[in-house]
């Protein structure tokens, strides 16, 4: 039985993860964590998940929660995730991180900390999205430089980072397949007389509004034809189920930094 703790247990995503753990054979909720001063600290974690009481109290004691689990699932912010990763490292516990918005420097720090424990760091835990990553690489290699690439993503109005971590990863996957440096070819803004589109650029466009869970479309646009590869998330349950799958997988791995491509055996 894999003992899984959840960081951000009182949030929307945290509740869905707790529900997913309860539905997963071979896994159990061992701890629930929230920030200091959160009004749900001290309450049973099952209520936010729609399960009723499950006998696990939401705590603000990070070290105690980590020490009581095999693996921590974290959907917070890069700053909080790195702190949680450090504490997991000190206690030799695995961690699954689904937070987005990491800078290159923060990702490098995560990789350094992952030398001591197995870590899954993925911008999107969905099986479908990770299949898309593989498909995008294959399509980009086949089409080469003859097709322009544009990426459009849409999320709910509460999302804090832009573009989404998934959209960035899609851009990175395509750029790598085409032998380009994503950081040099990504174009996030077009306005006014900005000149013709360059051959190598990858356009990144963002939509924010309402309660959109998540939509991503990658356009491969040629002369007289185009290919669109789209993934639409209808609920957050796919992310929560994916994170639990990653948690069960990572506890048996060697120290290192992994992503969902590793979890799903897509490499």
Swiss-Prot record:
It comes from Geotalea uraniireducens (strain Rf4). The keyword Transferase does not apply. This is 4-hydroxy-tetrahydrodipicolinate reductase. The active site is at 155 (proton donor/acceptor), 159 (proton donor). The keyword Cytoplasm applies. One of its GO terms (molecular function) is NADP binding. It is an enzyme of class 1 (oxidoreductase). Catalyzes the conversion of 4-hydroxy-tetrahydrodipicolinate (HTPA) to tetrahydrodipicolinate. The gene is dapB. Pathway: Amino-acid biosynthesis; L-lysine biosynthesis via DAP pathway; (S)-tetrahydrodipicolinate from L-aspartate: step 4/4.
